[in-house]
Swiss-Prot record:
Record Pfam families: UDPG_MGDP_dh, UDPG_MGDP_dh_C, UDPG_MGDP_dh_N
Annotated function: Dehydrogenase involved in the biosynthesis of the nucleotide-sugar UDP-N-acetylxylosamine (UDP-XylNAc). Catalyzes the conversion of UDP-N-acetylglucosamine (UDP-GlcNAc) to UDP-N-acetylglucosaminuronic acid (UDP-GlcNAcA). Cannot use UDP-glucose, UDP-galactose and UDP-N-acetylgalactosamine as substrates.
Taxonomic lineage from the root: Bacteria, Bacillati, Bacillota, Bacilli, Bacillales
Originating organism: Bacillus cytotoxicus (strain DSM 22905 / CIP 110041 / 391-98 / NVH 391-98)
Protein name: UDP-N-acetyl-D-glucosamine 6-dehydrogenase
Active site: 275 (nucleophile)
Gene3D superfamilies assigned to the protein according to its UniProt record, in alphabetical order: NAD(P)-binding Rossmann-like Domain
Length: 423
């Protein structure tokens, strides 16, 4: 059988480069390093590079002790893109996990993905395999990424290989880990897909090949579109049931006893994080390019956007400005230090605009810039809560003793956590 171009070029099949060392990239880099791969991490944020080199993790799911050991043993080395070119060129596999947010117009911001593609174009070596994991709309790999890399003069499927495998990670989830979550993979050609599978089958328990990158890209969006629609539904029903004098959580718990045909979703202050509020808007943007739109996504997004104002309205019903509102938890979900798209951000800005004084406690976020002001987390003490005019539970962190809220007046529990506190 004739070897394809580049097969003899690569000489270090155990070297992996991960571009982007955030909530997806760093745990993935650690996972590879722990399984014997020599891992190179690239990130333009010099502060991240410095912290990794010191063995100081900035992600709760990554142990500083583990990180320090891997760095000291040279199983994980980190650079900025500029200083890590040689290491990049000596890697057989390159995995891209850069952020794909939305801009102020609620449209896809592919700037980091495009920058990574240009970096690959400029430094590509024959025989390398590139795997993109960043969440994006269907067609991005074929219509945006590959045309940029093609400017190198190299041919996909012959000179280099490329595929898409949507990131699947649930921060703070101890049940489903990087290794155990099934991994969907795809390739631009059959050989590309084989290259992706060759690597990922060594570190993931289950690999799920699909027919094309577009299918894999859509898979990721569909997962989060489903969650947006269902969580927005229960948030709306929760509001309506309150006006009807019905305990919606009790009704939901009762409905959840049905062993078939029902999946429970739980209401809250609004959907946060980088994925669920963002990915559906990527799909909507792509649909609009074709003159189409999803009405269901549109309505679900609108409901989610209105949730912070709904919470502030509840606060105003209990306490008038210029009272003090004390937020417990500001991260977008429990047990993480991630503020991205957290409903706490617009809630705090709305409260300040109404004239309230705002304080917060979050065991994972010591300080946060919200609007034009920097807030510092205040220790959670009974005296502090007693002085507040309203207590607003936004994030139900596991390491908070919720008994401290018992007996307090004017508590808004957006997570239903106090129902679980023993009497």
């Amino acid at each position: 059988m004739e070897k394809e171009k580049g097969e003899e070029k690569m000489n270090d099949s155990r070297k992996i480069t991960v571009i982007g060392l955030g909530y997806v990239g760093l745990p993935l880099a650690i996972h590879f390093a722990e399984r014997g791969y020599n891992v190179v991490g690239l990130d333009k944020d010099k502060r991240k590079i410095e912290r990794i080199e010191k063995g100081d993790s900035y992600i709760p799911d990554v142990s500083s002790n583990v990180l320090k050991d891997l760095v000291q043993n040279k199983q994980l080395v980190v650079y900025t893109p500029h200083t890590g070119i040689e290491e990049f060129q000596n890697s057989e596999y390159v995995i891209v996990t850069v952020p794909t947010p939305i801009n102020k117009q609620k449209e896809p911001d592919l700037s980091a993905l495009i920058a990574a593609s240009h970096y690959i174009k400029q430094n590509l070596q024959a025989g390398q395999t590139f795997i993109f994991e960043s969440s994006t709309y269907p067609g991005t790999l074929e219509e945006v990424i590959i045309p940029i890399i093609a400017q190198s003069g190299k041919e996909v499927g012959k000179d280099y290989y490329i595929g898409y495998s949507p990131e699947r990670i649930d921060p703070a989830n101890q049940q489903y880990t990087v290794q155990t979550i099934p991994k969907v993979i795809s390739g631009q050609t059959e050989r590309c897909k084989q290259q992706v599978q060759k690597l990922y089958s060594t570190i993931f328990d289950t690999v799920v090949p699909v027919s094309s990158p577009k299918v894999a890209e859509m898979c990721k969006l569909f997962e989060n579109i489903q969650r947006l629609v269902n969580i927005s539904l229960v948030n709306e029903l929760n509001i309506l049931c309150e006006k009807l004098g019905i305990d919606f959580r009790e009704a939901l718990e009762a409905a959840a006893t049905k062993p078939f045909g029902f999946t429970p979703y739980w209401p809250g202050p609004g959907i946060g994080g980088h994925c669920i509020p963002v990915d559906p808007l990527y799909f909507q943007w792509k649909a609009r390019q074709l003159g189409q739109s999803s009405q269901l996504i549109e309505v679900a997004h609108m409901i989610n956007e209105k949730m912070p104002q709904q919470i502030v309205t509840q606060v105003k019903e209990l306490s008038a400005p210029p009272g003090t509102v004390f937020l417990i938890g500001i991260a977008y979900k429990k047990d993480v230090n991630d503020l991205r798209e957290s409903p706490a951000l617009p809630i705090i800005e709305l409260l300040v605009n109404e004239g309230y004084k705002v304080q917060y406690h979050d065991p994972y976020i010591s300080s946060a810039k919200i609007g034009d002001k920097i807030y510092d987390s205040i220790p959670l003490k009974k005296k502090t809560l007693e002085k507040a005019d309203c207590i607003l539970i936004v994030t139900d962190h596991s390491n908070i003793d919720w008994n401290i809220c018992k007996g307090m007046k004017h508590v808004i529990d957006t997570r239903g956590v106090l129902k679980k506190v023993s009497a």
